[in-house]
Amino acid sequence: EATRLKENVFYQRAYADYRGRFYLPSFSYAGSDLNRAIVEFADGVPMTQEGWDYLMLHTANVYGDNADFEEKISTSKSRLSLYLQVSNDPVGSFEIWSKADKPFCFLRACCEVRNIIRTCKNGDKFEFERFVSHLPCELDQSNSAYQHISLIMNDEELGKLSNLQGEYSDLYKTVADKLHCPAEKWEKRKIVKNVAVPWGYGASDVTIIRQLREWKNNENKAQYLRSLNWEELSELVTEVRRVIESIAPTVAKFRKEVSVVIGKRLGKGASELIWQTPMMFEVHQRFMKIKKLKAKVFSGHDIVELRAERPINEVEKRKHRSATAPNIVHSFDAAVVHSLLWNASYSGGTGNTQVSRTPLSFPVVTIHDAFSAHAPNLPELRSKLLKVIGGLYTHFDPFNNWLMLVGGEQQSRQISSDWIEKSKNAFS
């Protein structure tokens, strides 16, 4: 069946949740590592010298490198013999590529490198235009939740930690270096990432522990975690969270500021929060208490228990307080995607912003804070992303707008985008 369907063009539906975040079906580029490795663009683009550099960046990323943008490209170019070894003998080199951060994507990238070399190498030169690439190559937003919070709160120090400006910063390594757990350095950093990412978006300790329990089943990537029970995992998550809070106190400050506003709003009888993102997506946040229903019925063979949940007319205030700050970040995160796909450009100042659009000239796959395009199109994509996130905050001040819409006390933060557009590691 796979052979029959090979190279057939297909389209995938996407839907937006109530915050504006896009989701694709389970079998899609947004799916597993294997899914992502086998889905390609239907139309190809001729390779370029700059596109080759971005393919090197993509290959380094899926291999698992964590370094400065230019350093990753340079290191990746020094590994060409390894990439050829993997692509020429995937079975014999299984021990190499199976330990990559994204094994199947790494294998696919190695095959792309091999095919380009075979097609384009002419003596000591490369004639890149001879190769037509269909491979989606990815740019990830570095520490996206922390970037948004740094912009919301106008905190340049958090901006530096999350790679919005200055030299390369590895937030996860910075936290990992302060932990006392005896895990290997690479695993310690991975543990921190698996805590910091969901925590940045507002996940509870219990949710994070459950996710860690799933991840620790990976024998190659969680050797230390596999030795921990629930209580020990809980202690580890608490330690990681406290270190993050100590070096990024603005995150807790932002959540507290939002919680105070929500408390006042709920105290006045509100049952729903409504706000618009800069791209005019209207968020409706409504949390009601749930009545759980159970009933036992005969299925024809056995007695089975049916369970259902029905909302009742009582506001779930605790959920509003805990979920609003993360949902603000999620909605602003979604606005970056909407603005990019709309290819928006802005003029005017805060409160008097004009938005115009032109058709995007190349295909893009978006998965929340990850953006994929043909390698030759990544330089333009990267430039657009930096302008988008800079423009959203300097032309709109979306958090101030949120405060106005929900009845909070507005604060002018005078956010400058100069340092954002100069960043080379915000998307890499």
Regions found by a protein language model. Give the residues of each.
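Conserved catalytic core of nucleotide polymerization and phosphodiester-bond processing enzymes
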Residues: 1-428
